[in-house]
A protein has these predicted regions:
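Hydrophobic ligand-binding cavity/cleft-lining segments
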Residues: 1-52, 160-184
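Hydrophobic-ligand binding "helix-grip"
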Residues: 57-105, 109-113, 168-184
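Short, low-complexity, polar/charged sequence segments that are solvent-exposed and flexible
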Residues: 27-31, 90, 99-100, 123-128
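Glycine-rich loops and low-complexity Gly/Arg-rich segments
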Residues: 32-37, 95-97, 106-108, 128-133
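Short acidic, gly/pro-rich beta-turn/loop elements at beta-sheet edges
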Residues: 20, 31, 91-93, 114-116
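Hydrophobic pocket/interface hotspot
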Residues: 19-29, 71, 79, 104-106, ...
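A conserved amphipathic terminal alpha-helix motif
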Residues: 110-177
Length: 184
């Protein structure tokens, strides 16, 4: 079976040792999270009793929008999560030395079923914007020591339209009815 593969690469002017902590805090929802969380909410969840910011292979769940991922590996160079749910695949980062800087590669690979291809066509513009925005925010954090509060990268009309459709579809889902009070 063929796979859907999407790759983004950015060279940053900092060595791996300085990039690594920023990758570790992605999808944490905190102020050191480089994901464009001011536009698309993200989160991280660990088992009860574990440090909420820990990265525990096989246990840590991360996500954004309707997407959930389980951490497979993080060794300080390769950060990889598996897609949770009906779509098989993974995404992750690979850090490589590049002179006095670091090359950051973000890759997504998904099973190429018909439904996956159709779904990917809808979300690819949003995904591409989010990865490039994350890279922008990472570079800002490396320069200043702080992740910007607002994501400055403009969103293409196609990505904005797709994000609006995704948000509208989510808001139109039927809400669960509250259970009836006792005595009814």
């Amino acid at each position: 079976m063929q796979t859907i593969r999407n790759v983004h690469v950015r060279r940053v002017a900092a060595p791996i040792e300085r990039v690594r902590p920023w990758i570790e805090t992605c999808w944490s929802g905190g102020d050191r999270d480089c994901f464009p969380r001011d536009v698309i909410a993200d989160w991280r969840k660990n088992p009860p009793g574990a440090d909420p910011l820990a990265l525990i292979p096989g246990e840590t769940l991360v996500g954004h929008g309707p997407f959930r991922f389980r951490l497979r590996a993080w060794d300080g160079v390769v950060w990889r999560v598996d897609v949770v749910g009906s779509r098989g695949g993974w995404h992750g980062f690979h850090l490589q030395p590049d002179g006095d800087g670091c090359r950051v590669t973000h890759t997504v690979e998904l099973e190429s079923t018909l439904s996956a291809r159709l779904g990917w066509m809808a979300i690819e513009p949003i995904h591409d914007w989010a990865v490039e925005a994350l890279f922008d925010r990472l570079e800002h954090a490396l320069r200043t020591g702080v992740v910007p509060e607002r994501t400055e990268r403009p969103m293409s009309r196609v990505a904005a339209f797709a994000l609006g459709l995704a948000r509208g579809a989510r808001s139109r889902r039927p809400k669960a009815r509250p259970s009836a009070p006792m005595g009814w």
